[in-house]
Amino acid sequence: MKQKEHTVIISLASNENQEVNMAKAKEQLIQLLTEAHFTSAIWTDPVNSIRKEPYLNQLCRGTTAFGEGLLCEVLKEIEKRIGRTRNEDGIVVIDLDLLQYDNQRHHLRDWGRDYVNKLIQEL
C-alpha cells in the first residue's frame, strides 16, 4: 500500500554566506522531498535582528510521506548539518521553516511578510 504524500511549503532564509548556505539547503531538500520546486531567491532587509546583513529568502514546494512532526525534526537536523546554532548573536546560517503542511498553515506571521506573498505566486 502506497503511503499518502503530503504537500508542503518550506521557507529558506540565510543572513550568513547566503548563496552557499542556500545552495546546501536546496540540495538537502531535493533529497528529502518528492518533486521539489523552488521559487527565485530574493534579498530582504532584516526584521527584528541585531545584525544588519540582508537575508536571502526562497520558498520550496514539494511532497513527502513524512508526518508533520518528523518533517520538522528533519528540517532542524538539516539546519544543524549546514551549521545553524541556536545562539543569540543574530547569525542565521540557514533557517528552514515549514510554512504549510497539506492545508494547515504554520508560522502565521511569516505569511504576512512581503517576500512570502511575492514568492508564493511562483509556486
Name what the model sees in each region:
Residues 4-9:
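Extreme N-terminal starter segment of soluble prokaryotic enzymes
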Residues 11-13:
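Active-site nucleotide/adenylate-binding loops and adjacent lid/helix of ATP-dependent enzymes
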Residues 15-16, 65:
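Short, surface-exposed acidic/glycine-rich loop or hinge patches that mediate macromolecular interfaces
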Residues 17-21:
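Short N-terminal binding/cap micro-motifs at the start of the first secondary-structure element
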Residues 23-65:
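Short, surface-exposed acidic-centric catalytic microdomains
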Residues 47-56, 66-73, 77-123:
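Flexible, gly/pro- and Lys/Arg-enriched active-site loops
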